[in-house]
A protein has these predicted regions:
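C-terminal "cap" of GNAT-fold acetyltransferases
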Residues: 94, 139-143, 150-152, 159-179
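Conserved beta-hairpin
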Residues: 57-73
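Conserved acyl-donor/pantetheine-binding loop and adjacent beta-alpha core of acyl/acetyltransferases
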Residues: 74-102, 110, 163-166
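Conserved N-terminal entry element of GNAT/NAT acetyltransferase domains
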Residues: 1-18
């Protein structure tokens, strides 16, 4: 893991919300103009609206370099879909594992180890809070995300319809890290 630059990772506050909304806006615009690996939709997801929901339930985090928000993500125990279908190596009831959602990094900050620091933070947080593991789902062609998670020790748990009702993403790949 690149450790020459350290970032501050904390729960977002209402003061951070506007900047997180702008970050998601910038990232989704960039993805739509380039290769949109996660198939995110500008203005829909992730967005200021989804960030507000996560902030209100205490699951929105931001990564800062100085005063600038360079990344944001959600960490909670809600899979937002049917995770029961996964080929999990270990049965863990819903609510006893954490899930990473909406991990976005500004394009100009990619390749600086932010994603690795975020995943390590999520693993450490889940373990400290007594969860039994961390799970995540990615769009099948989201090679950068899958590579990041596998590099950090996650293992593949199958590709399934999570019953989210997203027609243009019929299946998601599931990954797990158990403690």
């Amino acid at each position: 893991m690149k450790d020459c630059i350290t970032y501050d990772i904390n729960k977002c506050t209402y003061d951070d919300l506007s900047a997180v909304g702008k970050l998601y806006d910038t990232v989704t615009k960039y993805l739509e103009e380039h290769v949109n690996y996660p198939k995110w939709t500008h203005g829909e997801y992730p967005s200021l609206a989804s960030a507000t929901i996560a902030l209100n339930d205490g699951s929105l985090y931001c990564v800062k370099q100085g005063d600038k928000i360079v990344s944001a993500f959600v960490l909670n125990s809600d899979p937002q879909g049917d995770y029961s279908v996964g080929d999990w190596s270990k049965f863990i009831p819903e609510g006893e594992y954490m899930v990473i959602h909406s991990l976005a990094v500004l394009d100009e900050c990619k390749g600086k180890g932010i994603g690795q620091q975020v995943v390590k933070f999520c693993l450490d947080t889940a373990k400290e809070q007594g969860y039994k593991g961390v799970r995540v789902d990615v769009v099948p062609d989201n090679f950068p995300a899958r590579n990041l998670y596998e590099k950090m020790g996650f293992t593949f748990a199958g590709e399934y319809d999570l019953k989210r009702g997203i027609e243009y993403i019929p299946t998601f790949q599931l990954l797990e890290f158990n403690f």
